Amino acid sequence: MEEVFTAALESKIFRKRWVLLPDYVPDVLPHREAELRRLAEVLAPALRGEKPSNALLYGLTGTGKTAVARLVLRRLEARASSLGVLVKPIYVNARHRETPYRVASAIAEAVGVRVPFTGLSVGEVYERLVKRLSRLRGIYIIVLDEIDFLPKRPGGQDLLYRITRINQELGDRVWVSLVGITNSLGFVENLEPRVKSSLGEVELVFPPYTAPQLRDILETRAEEAFNPGVLDPDVVPLCAALAAREHGDARRALDLLRVAGEIAERRREERVRREHVYSARAEIERDRVSEVVRTLPLHAKLVLLSIMMLEDGGRPASTGEIYERYKELTSTLGLEHVTLRRVSGIISELDMLGIVKSRVVSRGRYGKTREVSLDADRLAVENALSEDPFVARLL
């Protein structure tokens, strides 16, 4: 252990490692000037004490949505303060909070409401929030990151509707606006009409970064993050190229660069080279798979386990075979099974997440079927599944 600490102290790789972390927001965001300006235009009325429009920011993972929102609000809050106007951003991640109750609690606590961990309904938390806001002044801008997770929970759409209509219950001294951030371009289409009509007053779409744009971003951050001369010339272009293949994900590019540096540091090497980037890619993929599998709902985990068990036979499994094995597993656990249609939907979701791969094949006069196989590191999947006490009983 002591040698690990010594190696970290003696390392000459990093200067400011934290500028490569996902939650770091720099003062300059290359290739997002148009999005910064548009969101600033939407929120600028707050400087006059007026309610800004609600906004929805769309885009795939790593396209700069959250960073743009945070940078605009950071500057807006500072400018408002210099004018004697209170603008308070409230950041809540709907996926991390998991339930409408916890989302509502996080918003309420941000304005000084004490909320018990359990014991109240969402409606009661909302009423406490309204009561508290009614006594305040200023503009409160709620940023709901990964907002698409909220309507998937019971009561989530109702909470969204209430938030978008909350100003009708407040006086003219305080205003609330909502900025939603989502990776799902079809998010709004699945909402109830009453929610849809009031949620996305302004919509901003963030395109994926290109490889040259990712290279610009990495070069800017690398100047701050690393000591001079420690990066081989082809490290940044390689990180940019690998991330560009995955829909232009800047977060992925930054992770590759950071982990490559950490691997070089752990190996007590003085330079970061191509092989460190490839090692970083493998390490990140294992971590990504573990995180995705760990957070799957129970029935999705059982479907995934069914696919793995059937794959032991050496060939891809059909949807029908997966469903029969899944029903056996639910029976073993004493659970109600979901429908074949729902299992087919779960398989599509796992495919989209990159955990399995599926393809439709023709079986002649027997028609078409879908063949499914694992598309992620098997050991990483097994380890993540084993952390669930229910699933662990089946391994």
UniProtKB/Swiss-Prot annotation:
Contains an N-terminal AAA+ ATPase domain and a C-terminal winged-helix (WH) domain. Domains are separated by a rigid linker. InterPro entries: AAA+_ATPase, AAA_22, Cdc6_C, Cdc6_lid, ORC1/CDC6, Orc1/Cdc6_arc, P-loop_NTPase, WH-like_DNA-bd_sf. This is ORC1-type DNA replication protein 1. Involved in regulation of DNA replication. Binds DNA. GO terms for biological process: DNA replication. Belongs to the CDC6/cdc18 family. Keywords: ATP-binding, DNA replication, DNA-binding, Nucleotide-binding. NCBIfam families: orc1/cdc6 family replication initiation protein. It comes from the Archaea. GO terms for molecular function: ATP binding; ATP hydrolysis activity; DNA binding. It comes from Aeropyrum pernix (strain ATCC 700893 / DSM 11879 / JCM 9820 / NBRC 100138 / K1). HAMAP family: ORC1_type_DNA_replic_protein (MF_01407). ATP binds at T63, G64, K65, T66, A67, Y209, R221. The gene is orc1.
